[in-house]
Amino acid sequence: MCTVVDPRIVRRYLLRRQLGQGAYGIVWKAVDRRTGEVVAIKKIFDAFRDKTDAQRTFREITLLQEFGDHPNIISLLDVIRAENDRDIYLVFEFMDTDLNAVIRKGGLLQDVHVRSIFYQLLRATRFLHSGHVVHRDQKPSNVLLDANCTVKLCDFGLARSLGDLPEGPEDQAVTEYVATRWYRAPEVLLSSHRYTLGVDMWSLGCILGEMLRGRPLFPGTSTLHQLELILETIPPPSEEDLLALGSGCRASVLHQLGSRPRQTLDALLPPDTSPEALDLLRRLLVFAPDKRLSATQALQHPYVQRFHCPSDEWAREADVRPRAHEGVQLSVPEYRSRVYQMILECGGSSGTSREKGPEGVSPSQAHLHKPRADPQLPSRTPVQGPRPRPQSSPGHDPAEHESPRAAKNVPRQNSAPLLQTALLGNGERPPGAKEAPPLTLSLVKPSGRGAAPSLTSQAAAQVANQALIRGDWNRGGGVRVASVQQVPPRLPPEARPGRRMFSTSALQGAQGGARALLGGYSQAYGTVCHSALGHLPLLEGHHV
């Protein structure tokens, strides 16, 4: 019953396929019937179930309205109220895959990919931190990617603003939250009485290490085991570092240190890891939060120097002030009414995603320090839009290929060119250097060295690619509120797939690549017909 889609959603969007489902929601790939834009629709089940869920829904919507204009942060295009007054629909720009799927696939990320992905993550994190907002849940599955290696940070349900907290560190209490254990900072694991922006920098270090290693750096099976893996790898904390955490945490850390055997970070990484990557990792994975590199400092590190361009690294000049004080938890009806009020305000401003200030300037832009409207390379670098999807690709849909809105939202198509050339630290190309080809991320694992791939391996790669790539996408901008009154013209009915067309990727390992591609063998598969026998060469003395 939870998966029933409201009629207003069906009238506005053509649902293509389900991308994922969990205990709290479901995500579909869909096409806007009016514009042809490919989007991702997230339905949050019972979004206002209790105070915690209501607060998380409220935070995600408000913070995405504040930061969604950044080229490396996912854009919230629409917020739609469900008819049952419990669920809520969030419409996002569509991305092909996520970093977790790419890492699990193995062999797809080259050194230049790792550097560019991490640079874009640092750009997004710097923008958040400049508004004094901490994400608190940065992990590979929350880093979305496309084939142009463009990064979009998503899932702001656990993010919070530190601007409304008292200035005294003793008053910045840590609220309990459920984040993925493998990327939690030591102070979070130790239930320290305060936290800082350094929580995100630790998570970024874990993400970088996982991209370099191909698997998680600290895959703890419990909070205690997680802490043990960390403390036996990073340099031991000083007495001053332990005192800063509080007396309750100090005894726990000292007990865990003990006489356990130690290892170094370089022992966990491949032998060909660059010295710059190892140095950056060591500066991020530091026990004391105030001794870790900040996002601004990390952007100046030699590891990402080729992409570093200060004019393209946005920062806010003022803290983000949430619509509800972080230290005060509202009631469920109050959170619900505030979210619905935001939807009404968006609908009254011709589809814009932000409230307008006294001079028509949105709050997210009122204190934004960015030299240009859209971050891009110097004018000598050609700007290229998203690559067109081949007509022969599996699952190609003409409705997804062209987007009337795409031509109107040029500033949203600006992050891919950041990766199309090697730059000096000042954002200029080295003297005499030629323009580098566009950086793309092949989402299919390459086959053996120099050997021509067999038909079976080609089929297996194609099916695996279907499971990894979500499809083409077009960028958009601004939150819109769907109108229930307008009924768009009907599209021609889709061909209904047969039962054999489902779950081919999941059964590929058991049935083979060729069968997975065909969706199952027919009775004629693997047999030789009479006409084929007639063309076989006959040996001498055996003519009929």
Swiss-Prot record:
Phylogenetic placement of the source organism: Eukaryota, Metazoa, Chordata, Craniata, Vertebrata
Record-given protein name: Mitogen-activated protein kinase 15
InterPro entries: Kinase-like_dom_sf, MAP_kinase, MAP_kinase_CS, Prot_kinase_dom, Protein_kinase_ATP_BS
Record's catalysed reaction(s): L-seryl-[protein] + ATP = O-phospho-L-seryl-[protein] + ADP + H(+); L-threonyl-[protein] + ATP = O-phospho-L-threonyl-[protein] + ADP + H(+)
Annotated EC: 2.7.11.24
Activity modulation comment: Activated by threonine and tyrosine phosphorylation. Inhibited by dual specificity phosphatases, such as DUSP1. Phosphorylation and activation in response to DNA damaging agents, serum stimulation. Constitutively activated when phosphorylated on Tyr-177. Activity depends on the relative rates of MAPK15 autophosphorylation and dephosphorylation by PTPN1.
PTM note: Autophosphorylated on Thr-175 and Tyr-177; activates the enzyme.
Similarity remark: Belongs to the protein kinase superfamily. CMGC Ser/Thr protein kinase family. MAP kinase subfamily.
Motif TXY in this chain: 175-177
GO MF annotation list: ATP binding; chromatin binding; kinase activity; MAP kinase activity; protein kinase activity; protein serine kinase activity; protein serine/threonine kinase activity; SH3 domain binding
Residues that coordinate or bind ATP: L19, G20, Q21, G22, A23, Y24, G25, I26, V27, K42
Keyword Repeat: yes
Keyword Transferase among record annotations: yes
Domain notes: The N-terminal region (1-20) is the minimal region necessary for ubiquitination and further proteasomal degradation.
Phosphotyrosine modification, residue list: Y177
Protein role: Atypical MAPK protein that regulates several process such as autophagy, ciliogenesis, protein trafficking/secretion and genome integrity, in a kinase activity-dependent manner. Controls both, basal and starvation-induced autophagy throught its interaction with GABARAP, MAP1LC3B and GABARAPL1 leading to autophagosome formation, SQSTM1 degradation and reduced MAP1LC3B inhibitory phosphorylation. Regulates primary cilium formation and the localization of ciliary proteins involved in cilium structure, transport, and signaling.
PROSITE patterns hit by this protein: MAPK (PS01351), PROTEIN_KINASE_ATP (PS00107), PROTEIN_KINASE_DOM (PS50011)
Subcellular location: Cytoplasm, Cytoskeleton, Cilium basal body; Cell junction, Tight junction; Cytoplasm, Cytoskeleton, Microtubule organizing center, Centrosome, Centriole; Cytoplasmic vesicle, Autophagosome
First and last residues of every PXXXP motif repeat: 371-375, 378-382, 386-390, 394-398
Region (Requires for interaction with GABARAP, MAP1LC3B AND GABARAPL1): 300-373
Modified residues (Omega-N-methylarginine): R449
